[in-house]
Regions:
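Extracellular/periplasmic periplasmic-binding protein-like sensory domains
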Residues: 111, 214-295, 309-311, 362-390
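Extracytoplasmic ligand/sensor domains, especially the bilobed periplasmic-binding protein
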Residues: 6, 17, 66-174, 181, ...
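Solvent-exposed, acidic/polar segments of extracytosolic/periplasmic ligand-binding ectodomains
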Residues: 249, 324-391
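Signal peptide-proximal N-terminal region
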Residues: 6-44, 165-167
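Short beta->alpha junction loops
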Residues: 31, 36, 45-53, 146, ...
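Short, well-structured alpha-helical segments in soluble
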Residues: 46, 50-70, 130-135, 182-194, ...
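Short, charged, surface-exposed loops that flank catalytic or proteolytic processing sites
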Residues: 306-318
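Extracytoplasmic "Venus flytrap"
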Residues: 1-17, 48-53, 76-77, 145-153, ...
Length: 391
């Protein structure tokens, strides 16, 4: 993801005292001062995961063994994140997850050396369900199409549980192959299924193709059970919204952050504008939520090293567990000790009817406060185990 890669170049500059400092200006922790980390200049190496767990593992292993990487970060799939996190645990390296939204990353597959700033499937369901019930009513029948992998399953489960708790009924849930590009055979049965809502537990190209197919089949214009037929996309990204074009207009989903957040929702989300300014001046366009979470993770790692006074992974773990911070664009945030999951507000968004440009595709509908998306860390199983300090 070029956007995420771009976002990693920025904190390296800011940590080394170059550029305008970005969110170092607004971050509640003042340990970092632009002289690197513990006086050492920050350098980085990159590798392509190919959205493939084996390729990602090989790339991360090479960075650790050949390049001497002491922290690995990134990835844009939960399968990749879980694989690389496990490798880092075994190697005694800290893993700061990038764009991964499956419950498993900080649930059944959590590791002491791994940390996630991005939100998860459970939080999406908890944030989205009340809005869906409010806008579409409690008497709805949902049909799920679910990408056949880790993230798809936890997202379907989360959205099903949270909507059923508010009165919705799930009439069908059908798995779709990750490699699927033509979804017409999956969309065709929906209208005669008794459902009046289609929920697309799809990400990236899957979502672009399935949503386009659903709209071409006339689902958005259809009636079912005496109601307007609706489509929901639980997790939005800018690239997906752009790829699906006008088909996203009016469709609800969630995101972890948006570049307009501070301007639309106020100073609680300070740090947003500082980051948008830094990123925009360097790259000529506003950052995505993927860029944001990656930038935050790099600074949070650096700050934890600085506060703990050591690059030892166990010192970093100690500094991050239970760390409360602010000024990084999400409002007050907790890095929870029990599962290494950041607990913060979640945005409910929908596609704009008349976007001004490719970066203005989503509008903020509501913000679900952190308290309302908080869950018992034990519910997803797993065990952090002990930190591995490495060599």
């Amino acid at each position: 993801r070029n956007d995420a890669l771009n976002a990693y170049k920025l904190p390296v500059e800011h940590l080394n005292g170059e550029g305008d400092g970005g969110m170092l200006q607004t971050f509640s922790s003042k340990a970092l001062d632009g002289t690197g980390i513990l006086g050492k200049k920050v350098e980085y190496v990159t590798g392509d995961t190919q959205t493939n767990a084996d390729a990602a593992r090989a790339s991360a292993r090479s960075m650790i063994e050949k390049d001497g990487a002491i922290m690995i970060t990134g990835g844009s799939s939960s399968g990749v994140a879980v694989a690389v996190q496990s490798l880092c645990q075994d190697a005694g390296i800290i893993f700061m997850a990038g764009l991964t939204h499956s419950n498993d990353t900080t649930g059944k597959d959590k590791k002491a050396n791994g940390f996630r700033h991005f939100f998860n499937s459970y939080m999406t369901g908890a944030a989205l369900a009340p809005i869906l019930a409010d806008r579409y009513g409690a008497d709805r029948k949902a049909y799920h199409l679910t990408a056949d992998y880790n993230w798809g399953y936890t997202t379907e489960e989360a959205v099903r549980n949270s909507t059923e708790a508010l009165g919705w009924e799930t009439v069908a849930a059908v798995k779709t192959p990750l490699s699927q590009t033509d979804f017409s055979s999956y969309v065709a049965p929906v209208l005669n299924s008794g459902a009046d809502v289609l929920i697309l537990n799809h990400y990236g190209g899957n979502m672009v193709n399935s949503l386009t197919s659903a709209v071409e089949f006339g689902l958005r214009a259809a009636q079912a059970n005496g109601k307007n037929f609706e489509i929901v996309v639980p997790l939005y990204s800018r690239l997906m919204a752009k790829g699906a074009g006008k088909n996203v207009a009016g469709i609800f989903g969630t995101t972890g952050w948006h570049w307009s957040l501070e301007n639309t929702a106020g100073s609680r989300y300070t740090g947003t504008n500082a980051f948008v300014k830094s990123f925009g001046e360097k790259y000529g366009y506003p950052p995505s939520q993927a860029a944001h979470t990656c930038y935050c993770q790099a600074l949070l790692y650096a700050d934890a090293v600085q506060r703990g006074g050591s690059f030892n992974p166990c010192s970093v773990v100690e500094a991050l567990e239970g760390f409360e911070f602010d000024g990084m664009g999400n409002g007050p945030t907790l890095y929870r000790a029990e599962d290494h999951q950041c607990i913060k507000d979640v945005l409910v968004v929908r596609g704009k009817e008349n976007p001004a440009n490719d970066f203005d595709l989503l509008e903020l509908v509501d913000i679900t406060p952190a308290e309302a998306v908080t869950f018992d860390p034990a519910i997803f199983g797993g065990n952090l185990g002990s930190c591995n300090p490495g060599a």
